[in-house]
């Protein structure tokens, strides 16, 4: 599962 989202000007990517 891949997820990416934008939070407080920072991009988080969870694999």
Curated annotation (Swiss-Prot):
Please, which domain of life does this record's source organism belong to?
Bacteria
Reactions catalysed, as given in the entry: Hydrolysis of terminal, non-reducing (1->4)-linked alpha-D-glucose residues with release of alpha-D-glucose
EC assignment: the record states 3.2.1.20
Q: What are the protein's UniProt keywords?
A: Glycosidase, Hydrolase
Gene Ontology molecular function terms on file: alpha-1,4-glucosidase activity
**Hydrolase: present as a keyword of the record?**
yes
* Family classification: Belongs to the glycosyl hydrolase 13 family.
Q: What is the name of the protein in this document?
A: Maltase
């Amino acid at each position: 599962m891949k997820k990416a989202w934008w939070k407080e000007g920072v991009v988080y990517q969870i694999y």
